[in-house]
Amino acid sequence: MKKNYRFSTALSQFSADSFRQGKSLRFPSPAKLNLFLYINGKRADGYHELQTLFQFLDYGDWLEISARADGEIHLTPQLPGVKEEDNLIYRAAHILQQNTGCTLGADIRLDKILPMGGGVGGGSSNAATVLVALNYLWKTRLSLSELADLGVKLGADVPIFIHGNAAFAEGVGEKLTDCEPPEKWFVVLKPETSISTALVFTHPDLPRNTPKRPLTRLLTEEYGNDCEKVVRNCYPEVEETLTWLLKYAPSRLTGTGACVFAEFDNEKSAQAVFDMKPASVSGFVAKGCNRSPLHQWLDKIS
């Protein structure tokens, strides 16, 4: 079956066989945006205290997964420059095996569309989808909370994808409160550069003392990203792309970048701006969604 990277289209066409790809089952791995990101302090262990609002996008990768009896994990295709044992997909499968004693293995095929290192959660989303999907296929019966405890060992953003709802995150990202921000349309652009998260979080100009505010107040104020100024100053490609996008709509950085996004009230307006984008940047148009497409998909097949 032809894959559609807008999951709502696949969901609307759902049938008993629509999630099958041969012997494999297909699972969505959606993108996310940080609608705002504020850094409230730095802890003694080096981690930063933050407040951020996560929302999923109706767009992302697909993972085709089937169980195998020999306990081996086979992943295709291999990501360029990433050793198999360092790949988050491979590590997610192994951590579930190790923590449940499951003797089954898996064949996993990644259909990758999300940019790597873009701040839209591609790797974290892939890891979360593998944990949730294999928990279903292997019948290991861990709760979402137990899966999230495994996921955080793989990356700070993995639990939000396992959690499955748009959420306000505090602390180092581990304290989650369900939230329902407006589900707007977004133009997401990826400048031709890669961001060093370590550079951003160690930069002397990074704000580290933004006062904590209650969610009710944050939702009514203009959204911002404390990492944006540093990234714009250090990466001219991001500065150029964001400056262009700001001519058309409220726009900002997601996470530490490199992706930037603009929000619109409807698809037509978003698509019109996207169609004018500079040729040097890639990107996509997608709608925000407060319920993860992965969990919507699981609701259908369960």
From Swiss-Prot:
The record's function comment reads: Catalyzes the phosphorylation of the position 2 hydroxy group of 4-diphosphocytidyl-2C-methyl-D-erythritol.
List the InterPro entries hit by this protein, alphabetically. Answer: GHMP_kinase_C_dom (IPR013750), GHMP_kinase_C_sf (IPR036554), GHMP_kinase_N_dom (IPR006204), IspE (IPR004424), Ribosomal_Su5_D2-typ_SF (IPR020568), Ribsml_uS5_D2-typ_fold_subgr (IPR014721)
The protein's GO terms of the molecular function aspect are: 4-(cytidine 5'-diphospho)-2-C-methyl-D-erythritol kinase activity; ATP binding
- The UniProt entry's coiled-coil ranges are none
List the catalysed reactions: 4-CDP-2-C-methyl-D-erythritol + ATP = 4-CDP-2-C-methyl-D-erythritol 2-phosphate + ADP + H(+)
- Tell me the Gene3D superfamilies matching this sequence: 3.30.230.10, GHMP kinase, C-terminal domain
- Can the keyword Zinc be found in this entry's annotation? no
Q: Which organism is it from?
A: Actinobacillus succinogenes (strain ATCC 55618 / DSM 22257 / CCUG 43843 / 130Z)
Which protein family is named in the record?
A: Belongs to the GHMP kinase family. IspE subfamily.
Q: Which GO terms describe its biological process?
A: isopentenyl diphosphate biosynthetic process, methylerythritol 4-phosphate pathway; terpenoid biosynthetic process
Top-level taxon of origin: Bacteria
The EC number(s) attached to this protein equal 2.7.1.148
The EC class name is transferase
Q: Where is the active site?
A: K32, D157
Q: What is this protein called?
A: 4-diphosphocytidyl-2-C-methyl-D-erythritol kinase
Keyword terms: ATP-binding, Isoprene biosynthesis, Kinase, Nucleotide-binding, Transferase
Q: So, what pathway does this thing act in? A: Isoprenoid biosynthesis; isopentenyl diphosphate biosynthesis via DXP pathway; isopentenyl diphosphate from 1-deoxy-D-xylulose 5-phosphate: step 3/6
Indicate which residues the UniProt annotation says bind ATP.
P115, M116, G117, G118, G119, V120, G121, G122, G123, S124, S125
Give TM segment ranges: none
